[in-house]
Regions:
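A short, terminal or domain-edge coil/loop segment
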Residues: 13, 152-164, 238-254, 361-380
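Active-site nucleotide/adenylate-binding loops and adjacent lid/helix of ATP-dependent enzymes
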Residues: 84-210, 387
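Short, solvent-exposed loop/turn segments at secondary-structure junctions
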Residues: 107-108, 142-144, 194-195, 219, ...
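Protein kinase-like catalytic core scaffold
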Residues: 136, 222, 323-325
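A long amphipathic alpha-helix within ATP-dependent nucleotide-binding catalytic cores
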Residues: 177-205, 214-217, 223-225, 229-318
Length: 387
């Protein structure tokens, strides 16, 4: 939708004039969050019942989030977030619970612990016929947003076909020859996690996990924000995908683990829900099981990754407790901003960046002379660790 179309629709709904909206947009684009026009509407910053100028300026756009990453994430640490096998290796070695890995596909023979490495289609086929446990979940080691993932229920040995969780079927050889090897980092075959029964009965068959944003403060890791990524329909992942997936977001009170509100979609198409549209179960007011255990494990794990001053942890709550899926850079500010109706640059976050000594990089325009002369980056970490 174009700016003018959006502006006219907002004027019709709220009475806020087009020029008034344009003034907001220009001010926010030049401000610390560097929001664009589309983000103004995506985050519903025109809504005067929730927003004033101060609250609008707490929101961060994708341009602002890039500067946050440049400032708060060590460049040399990023592989831990980008490559899932690297993360799994570290987390497993440190004793944290991760999904059970069945095998790795990697043409050059990349290894992981004591699981088999499959180097070609023939070895994949043999493993799928005789070696793997069903059901299983597959995903690229490099990638995100649910791209390249597959959820397999079982194998029809007589027909030599895999039965997928969405009802589709694939010939085993067809599946094996079509596996991606993105960035040469391989493909992971792992257990298909079963979420806690209290979550499953509400969210359906998909794996509905939680995203916890942690700040690495001088006094130690602090849980800052949390969101429940609620699955919908036949979706096998909980990715929100800017509202296009049909999945929902639940804002979680960090202290209690109670879901305080739930939204679906973005911007002018956003709706607020109290119950799941398919299961009919209550979402708002639901207390996430094992919440304190999930918070505890994320805070303990956070200290093992000092190159990430802001961390976004993906955690699945299983019947027996929390399981770590991955650790993200920042962790997608949009998820929290949409779910919470609140920008991440609130008072707590501003105190944090002041504590880290990087507030000038995030206060407004980021000029070239503010970059570290040695590394060419904004970041405290690159300046602090002169590799």
């Amino acid at each position: 939708m174009s700016f003018l179309s959006s502006a006219k629709k907002v004027r019709a709904i709220t009475g806020k004039g087009v020029l008034s909206q344009l003034g907001d947009i220009v001010g926010l684009r030049l401000g610390p969050g560097k929001l664009g026009a589309a983000e103004y509407y995506d985050y519903r910053l025109f809504d005067e019942s929730r927003m004033n100028d101060e609250r609008r300026r707490e929101f961060v756009g994708w341009r602002g989030e890039e500067i946050l990453e440049d400032t708060l994430i060590d460049e040399y640490s990023k592989i831990v977030s980008i490559d899932k096998l690297t993360f799994y290796s570290l987390a497993r070695g440190l004793g944290f619970r991760i999904p059970r890995i069945y095998s790795i596909y990697h043409p050059a023979g990349r290894a992981f612990a004591d699981v088999p490495t499959l180097r070609d289609a023939e070895s994949i086929v043999r493993f799928l016929r005789n070696g793997i446990e069903y059901p299983f979940f597959g995903k690229p080691s490099y990638g995100g947003y649910g791209q390249g993932v597959v959820s397999v229920d079982s194998i029809d040995r007589a027909a030599d076909r895999l039965k997928l969780s969405n009802g589709d079927e694939l010939e085993v050889m067809q599946f094996a020859t079509g596996l991606p090897n993105r960035a040469g980092m391989g493909y992971i075959f792992q257990e298909r996690l079963a979420v806690h029964p209290e979550i499953r009965v509400r969210s359906g068959a998909g794996v509905a996990g939680c995203r916890l944003m942690v700040l690495m403060r001088a006094s130690g890791p602090q849980l800052f924000r949390a969101v429940w990524k609620i699955t919908s329909g036949d979706n096998i992942t909980d990715n929100f995908s800017h509202g296009k997936s049909g999945n929902m977001l639940g804002s979680i009170d960090p202290d209690s683990g109670v879901v305080t509100s739930v939204v679906r979609g973005m911007g002018l198409d956003q709706s607020e829900l109290t119950h799941h549209p398919e299961t009919g179960k209550t979402l708002a007011g639901f207390e996430i099981p094992y919440w304190q255990e999930a918070v505890s494990v994320c805070l303990r794990a956070a200290g093992a990754f000092p190159g990430f001053l802001v961390q976004g942890w993906d955690v699945v709550i299983s019947e027996s407790g929390p399981v770590l899926l991955e650790m993200n850079m920042i962790g997608c500010a949009d998820l929290h901003q949409i779910a919470d109706h609140r920008g991440i640059r609130d008072q707590v976050f501003r105190e944090f960046v002041q504590e880290m000594g990087v507030e000038r990089n995030l206060a407004g325009a980021s000029w070239p002379w503010m970059r570290n002369a040695k590394t060419g980056r904004y970041g405290r970490r690159q300046a602090h660790w002169p590799y």
